[in-house]
Amino acid sequence: LTEGMHGMISQVEGLAKALELDFFHEKIELNSFWKFVPPKFTPIKKFVFKNIIEKDFDVIISCGRKSVIPSIFFKKNSQKRIFNIHIQNPKISLKNFDFVVAPEHDDLKGENVISTKGALHYLTMQEIDENRSYLEGKINKKKDIIILILGGPTKYYKYTKDNIQKIYTSLNENINKKNLQLIVIPSMRTPVETIKLAKEYFGPDHLIIDNVDKKAYLSALSLAKFIVVTCDSSSMISEASLTGKPIYVAQISSSKNDYRFKRFRDLFKELNIIKELNDNLENWSYQSLDETNRVAQEIKKKLS
């Protein structure tokens, strides 16, 4: 159960795959008034949401605020024992769930809480390696590859032309200094103008992917020597950390207090996974981070 956003789908489906479950995905829709009410003030009643699930199920994996009440409702009203797992802080009594999976930077404590370094996701190294050839024919094999993974505007980070140009300028200095080729990978949130500006700025010698393309994303992760991710997406930074390759974070000035994102990035800096994008690229390595499988093993152990 999710609100349908990529970062949430990646987490629930990643955990379902790691638990070796057959699954179906349900995008939760709350009825008008309840969209604006925090879970702790919402009744656990059917009139809160629109979804009707007729398929049989044994486990619920939910992520995001809107899926909290439906998860509890379906568990309580089932004719059989249902295990429910919520990803992220549900901001309601943790006793409503069998497991709550939350990042360390949320600082959530409880007997049924499993803390993670960063976000869960659905990528595997096997899948990344299998898709390497997808972009291989479009790159200059004599050059090392640097990739830029773009997020998109949020209430904390604005994708203004000025903010994006600063990132492109910093990237360009590194590209010229080290004679690199760039691959730009957009996400669902990336504005069209940001991609258009990349094409104008970097020109035909670099590869700018126009649309969301999972195969291109996986291929780029495989081909990259250096990875750059915009600071607005903890999910994409977590996904990139599976590779064990150097990850640089492209900063955007925050328009609101982004302390949770900063805590996440500080943790990843301590783990030697990320550094801030500057004009001097270094090569380093770290222990590949695969929290999805670690969490799945912990859940399996507790369930058995």
Q: Which residues are covered by each model-predicted region?
A:
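A donor-sugar binding/catalytic signature common to diverse glycosyltransferases
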Residues: 3-8, 217-258
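Active-site and donor-binding regions of nucleotide-sugar-utilizing enzymes
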Residues: 5-121, 128
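Short, aromatic/basic amphipathic alpha-helical patches
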Residues: 13-16, 73-75, 99, 193-202, ...
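Short internal beta-strands
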Residues: 26-27, 101-102, 182-188, 248
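A nucleotide-sugar donor-handling region in carbohydrate enzymes
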Residues: 94-160, 277, 283-289, 293
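Conserved catalytic-core segment of nucleotide-activated headgroup transferases in glycan assembly
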Residues: 153-185
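Catalytic donor nucleotide-activated moiety binding site of glycosyltransferases and closely related
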Residues: 179-213
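Leloir-type glycosyltransferase catalytic cores
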Residues: 265-304
